[in-house]
């Protein structure tokens, strides 16, 4: 993201840790903007970004392995404060002349450190519980460094070169298990990097509107509306920035929730006075998806067809150069980087055709889900719209496992409507992060009345989360679940069983496909 000159930035460099996004989250929660970049970022790009501080993340590699991730040692001469976490500390040690070796035993879990009072541990107790996750250890620190924390298992739990403002910690301050982790990160961000902490959604809107106007000029933009919160927020942000230069295309692909299409047209077309074209492409999508059961293939087909529909609609308009999408930061992260395996391709990331004729605008691709909701409120979108259930671009296409048919879509559509209605009636909308039904493609024997049935099973997925990167299954009252189950079985044709998904993320993702 292009940052305004006055915008404070903490740059997090990615070495493959599963906790990378948590570092970024923790810093943003302090009111300071933070971005995650690949460790191969050039010195020129770092200088252009002009960060107030740099954090080197943890990672699964060993620094002494031949193909281990590394950085340009010139980074330590930029005069910018640096904090190395776990692998980041070991890499700093190696590059600056210290020594690292494999530990006798891998240290994973809670540990106790003894810390000295310095800038990093300012105001914190000497003895602290921290979270360790490493199999290597520092055995000799570089010249100019001193120890600022130790533990029973290592003499070098934390180190510093005070004159150059370079720090390293062997533990993970970004995870909740580290007792004073947030305080340590805050000390680095506020005391060492001298950040004021003025980043807010109001500030983000000002910066993003200026960026959009500079990028677009007097040209036109198409916005892909899916009916979900993300694309809706993007549409309103763009409309605020460029007004009538924006045309929203709402593709009714037949994979929408019950009543979704009419709601979008009413709330945004009429409510926000936006130019929205509703395209009926149901037959087109169903034709392409016929016989397809692989989830990745379904996602890519849906992504491709979205773009081709836009191409068709854009050809009817003049001077359209840009396509706007509601891609989130979590979408980008989950689609994989050089240091992380792809979990699943995202419909806004992995499904784009190579011959796409539009330039992309993705104004919220640096925001997490809760930040997008905050942005929506700041933009004046009513709360009942901002707090609608997250809905993926592929829609119900990834909530029908296996091949998609009209009958299966109807089961998911009707069962999902019942689930949402009961959750709303029980006042649980704000307590549960996301909830929906899924058709797993399982049929089982049942008895309804005096007759044997062999019908579909509907799965209920309901999770609690803050940012969508991790989640836990929602502890919904059994009586509420029984009410939902009873209504689905009695009101939705060809369903004789309802199950509840009690898996967390990880190991599962929130969506089933």
UniProtKB/Swiss-Prot annotation:
Q: What GO cellular component entries does it have?
A: cytosol
Q: What class of enzyme is it?
A: ligase
Q: Which UniProt keywords apply?
A: ATP-binding, Glutamine amidotransferase, GMP biosynthesis, Ligase, Nucleotide-binding, Purine biosynthesis
Reaction catalysis annotation: XMP + L-glutamine + ATP + H2O = GMP + L-glutamate + AMP + diphosphate + 2 H(+)
Domain Glutamine amidotransferase type-1 residue range list? 9-198
The record ties this protein, via InterPro entries, to: Class_I_gatase-like, GATASE, GMP_synth_C, GMP_synth_GATase, GMP_synthase, GMPS_ATP_PPase_dom, Rossmann-like_a/b/a_fold
Q: Name one GO molecular function term.
A: GMP synthase activity
- Signal peptide from the UniProt entry: none
Q: Where is the GMPS ATP-PPase domain?
A: 199-388
Active site positions, chain numbering: 86 (nucleophile), 172, 174
According to its UniProt record, in which pathway does this protein act? Answer: Purine metabolism; GMP biosynthesis; GMP from XMP (L-Gln route): step 1/1
Query: Recorded E.C. number(s)?
Result: 6.3.5.2
Keyword Nucleotide-binding assigned: yes
Positions of ATP binding: 226-232
Tell me, how does this one assemble?
Answer: Homodimer.
Q: What is this protein called?
A: GMP synthase [glutamine-hydrolyzing]
């Amino acid at each position: 993201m292009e940052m305004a000159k006055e915008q404070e930035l903490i740059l997090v460099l990615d070495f493959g840790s599963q906790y990378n996004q948590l570092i970024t989250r923790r810093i943003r929660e302090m009111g300071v903007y933070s971005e995650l970049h690949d460790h191969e970022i050039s010195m020129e790009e770092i200088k252009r970004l002009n960060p107030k501080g740099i954090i080197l993340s943890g990672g699964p590699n060993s620094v002494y392995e031949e193909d281990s991730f590394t950085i340009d040692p010139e980074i330590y001469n930029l005069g910018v404060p640096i904090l190395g976490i776990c692998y980041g500390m070991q890499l700093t040690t190696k590059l600056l002349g210290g020594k690292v070796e494999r530990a006798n035993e891998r240290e994973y879990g809670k540990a106790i450190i003894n810390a000295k009072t310095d800038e990093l541990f300012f105001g914190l107790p000497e003895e602290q519980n921290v979270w360790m996750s490493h199999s290597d250890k520092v055995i000799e620190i570089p010249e100019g460094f001193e120890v600022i924390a130790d533990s029973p298992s290592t003499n070098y739990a934390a180190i510093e070169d005070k004159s150059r403002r370079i720090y390293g910690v062997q533990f993970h301050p970004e995870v909740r298990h580290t007792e004073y982790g947030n305080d340590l990160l805050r000390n680095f961000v506020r005391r060492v990097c001298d950040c004021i902490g003025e980043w807010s959604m109001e500030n983000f809107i000002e910066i993003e509107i200026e960026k959009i106007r500079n990028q677009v000029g007097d040209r036109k933009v198409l916005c892909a509306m899916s009916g979900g919160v993300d694309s809706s927020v993007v549409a309103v942000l763009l409309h605020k920035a460029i007004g009538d230069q924006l045309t929203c295309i709402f593709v009714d692909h037949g994979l929408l929730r019950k009543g979704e299409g009419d709601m979008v047209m009413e709330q945004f077309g009429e409510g926000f006075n936006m130019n929205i074209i509703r395209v009926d492409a149901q037959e087109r999508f169903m034709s392409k998806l016929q016989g397809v059961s692989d989830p990745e293939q379904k996602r890519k087909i849906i992504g491709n067809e979205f773009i081709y529909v836009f191409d068709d609609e854009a050809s009817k308009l003049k001077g359209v150069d840009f396509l706007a999408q509601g891609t989130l930061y979590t979408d980008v992260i989950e689609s994989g980087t050089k240091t992380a395996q792809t979990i699943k391709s995202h419909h806004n990331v992995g499904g784009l055709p190579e011959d796409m004729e539009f330039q992309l605008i993705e104004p919220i691709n640096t925001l997490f889900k809760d930040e997008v909701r905050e942005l929506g409120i700041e933009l004046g979108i009513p709360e009942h719209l901002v707090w609608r259930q997250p809905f993926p671009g592929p829609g119900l296409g990834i909530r029908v496992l296996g091949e998609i048919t009209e009958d299966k879509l109807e089961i998911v559509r009707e069962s999902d409507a019942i689930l949402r209605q009961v959750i709303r009636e029980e006042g649980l909308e704000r307590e549960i992060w996301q909830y929906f039904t899924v058709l797993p493609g399982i049929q089982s024997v049942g008895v309804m009345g005096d007759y044997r049935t062999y019908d579909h099973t509907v799965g209920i997925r309901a999770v609690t989360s803050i940012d969508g990167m991790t989640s836990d299954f929602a502890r919904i009252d059994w009586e509420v679940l029984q009410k939902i189950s009873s209504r689905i079985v009695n009101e939705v044709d060809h369903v004789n069983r309802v199950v509840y998904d009690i898996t967390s993320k990880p190991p599962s993702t929130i969506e089933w496909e």
